[in-house]
Amino acid sequence: MKYINLMLTIILALSLETFHIIDACREIGEVCSKTVFDKCCGNTVCKLRGPFYGECVECLNSGERCWRNSECCSGYCRWFTCQD
């Protein structure tokens, strides 16, 4: 019974820590990975410089890789690239 209580306590502690990590976000200029674990705060976006490695910026410039219109400074993302 003690073993089960110990395991449940450990699982609960790890779960709470995971939720804390997921809720955290990065400010402009900080390192990000464009994942739920390393996301940028607010309306800022992660400008990737390599696989899962980038920096939080206000918006992406023309020619940079994007997923949504809202990520681009121009507001226009076409074929995964910001356009003017």
From Swiss-Prot:
<keyword id="KW-0964">Secreted</keyword>
<feature type="signal peptide">
    <location>
        <begin position="1"/>
        <end position="24"/>
    </location>
</feature>
<feature type="disulfide bond">
    <location>
        <begin position="66"/>
        <end position="77"/>
    </location>
</feature>
<dbReference type="Pfam" id="PF11703">
    <property type="entry name" value="UPF0506"/>
</dbReference>
<protein>
    <recommendedName>
        <fullName>Uncharacterized protein SJCHGC09800</fullName>
    </recommendedName>
</protein>
<feature type="disulfide bond">
    <location>
        <begin position="59"/>
        <end position="73"/>
    </location>
</feature>
<feature type="disulfide bond">
    <location>
        <begin position="72"/>
        <end position="82"/>
    </location>
</feature>
<dbReference type="GO" id="GO:0005576">
    <property type="term" value="C:extracellular region"/>
</dbReference>
<keyword id="KW-1015">Disulfide bond</keyword>
<dbReference type="InterPro" id="IPR021712">
    <property type="entry name" value="UPF0506"/>
</dbReference>
<keyword id="KW-0960">Knottin</keyword>
<keyword id="KW-0732">Signal</keyword>
